[in-house]
A protein has these predicted regions:
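Phosphate-binding/switch loop-helix module in NTP-utilizing enzymes
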Residues: 65-109, 122-123
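The feature captures the helix immediately C-terminal to the Walker
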Residues: 17-19
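Conserved lysine of the Walker
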Residues: 13-14
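N-terminal phosphate/diphosphate-binding loop that engages ATP/GTP or pyrophosphate donors
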Residues: 22-74
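Hydrophobic anchor at the beta1->P-loop junction of P-loop NTPases
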Residues: 5
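Walker A (P-loop) phosphate-binding loop of P-loop NTPases
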Residues: 10
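Walker A (P-loop) ATP-phosphate-binding motif of ABC ATPase nucleotide-binding domains
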Residues: 2
């Protein structure tokens, strides 16, 4: 089963995903934690849920100082492509060990366009394991269509993160 946590930008999708995981600490996965500089988004760190390891994921171009060995770019953000390779390796282990559910935050335009977690999400969907993913509300249908997710439960988040 795929559970999609959805809401508008800053509605609390990541907070809801973290609360869902922390209720019983079953499964494993990753949450994208927003890093602020005053009122501006500095970037995002990736939190590995089972061990609380934090790894830089994206840095806004305004603050980027060649922080990553291998980079990609999405909008105004530089991506840590080494992190993606590491995430894929960890997800492969979770699939092999049949760890469930697996959490992934956040799936969106980058993945629809073949980047970010695209390959990771394809593997997860093929695995048959339970998934919990965060998706912005205006992207639920495009994500479900692109990844051929037909059966899913929606968790609507109304608040602000």
């Amino acid at each position: 089963m795929v559970k999609i946590i959805t809401g508008k930008v800053n509605a609390g999708k990541t907070t809801t995903l973290l609360k869902t995981y922390r209720l019983d600490r079953k499964g494993d996965g990753f949450a994208a934690i927003k890093k602020m500089n005053g009122n501006e988004v500095y970037g995002y760190n990736m939190l590995h849920l089972s061990n609380d390891n934090i790894i830089p994921w994206m840095v806004h171009q305004k603050y980027y100082q060649r922080d990553f060995t291998k980079t990609g770019k999405f909008g105004p953000f530089y991506l840590n492509l080494d992190l993606l390779a590491m995430l894929e390796s960890i997800i492969d282990e979770l699939i092999a060990q049949r760890i469930s559910p697996i959490y992934l935050d956040e799936v969106g335009v980058l993945e629809i366009n073949g980047g970010g977690y695209h390959n990771i999400l394809k593997k997860l969907l093929s695995s048959g394991l339970d998934l919990v993913i965060a998706v912005r509300d205006d992207l639920v249908k495009p994500v479900a269509s692109h990844f051929d997710i037909k059966d899913y439960e929606l968790v609507q988040v109304q608040g602000e993160e």
